Design a protein with these regions (language model features):
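Bacterial N-terminal signal peptides
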Residues: 7-14
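An acidic-aromatic
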Residues: 57-105, 168
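Gly/Pro-enriched, hydrophobic low-complexity segments
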Residues: 114-193
Length: 193
């Protein structure tokens, strides 16, 4: 009986620590991220085909983002419901619904990580926190890995895996947070037919 009790403690105790550490990491990220209302900087993107794109990004909570590509003729603007592809003059080329998209959830006013995501793991290393998760109530099996700066809780990197396991990676640098970003930056124009 004594050996059974010791074995049970050794088996269950590490899991208890792991859950407690995960909850602490999630809490730190959530608190810090919810304090950030705007964020801008530069990004580099590697798509599922291995192509590298660079540019500037802008986040304005709730739900608005813009990715201005340095070496493409198109940019991306998002709001709560749509991802829009626009030309360099701001005219819409195409749009897609983003109902359960990770970016939409991240850019909400008050992110509740455990409500919005199914956590696979949350780890802490010397410089950052990393979470791998799926989107709760999503109709796809897409996954996301999010990396946050440990000191500033700035989003440094995301890796998105779609249902076919294609991966898109964005890394964020030269980050500024809680600065003024005009609503006009996210205006999409439409051509008259």
């Amino acid at each position: 009986m004594f050996r059974f009790s010791i074995s049970l403690i050794l088996i269950l105790f590490p899991w208890h620590i792991s859950f407690a550490e995960t909850d602490l990491i999630i809490s730190k990220i959530q608190t810090g991220w919810n304090d950030i209302q705007t964020m801008s900087g530069e990004f580099s993107q590697i798509d599922s085909d291995g192509n590298l794109e660079t540019g500037k990004f802008y986040f304005l909570k709730p739900y608005q983002s813009k990715f201005v590509y340095a070496n493409k003729d198109e940019d991306i603007v998002t709001n709560e419901t749509l991802l829009r592809i626009i030309d360099k003059k701001g005219f819409q080329i195409d749009s897609y619904a983003i109902a359960g998209n990770a970016l939409k959830k991240l850019l909400s006013n008050n992110l509740d990580i455990e409500k919005e995501f199914t956590i696979d793991y949350a780890i802490e290393n010397e410089f950052n926190y990393e979470i791998q998760a799926g989107i709760k109530n999503a109709s796809t099996s897409s996954r996301v890995i999010l990396t946050f700066n440990k000191d500033t809780i700035e989003l440094e990197k995301w890796e998105i895996f779609d249902e076919l396991d294609n991966k898109t990676v964005l890394e964020f640098t030269k980050i500024k947070k809680n600065i003024f970003i005009s609503q006009n930056l996210f205006v999409v124009r439409y051509k008259n037919n």
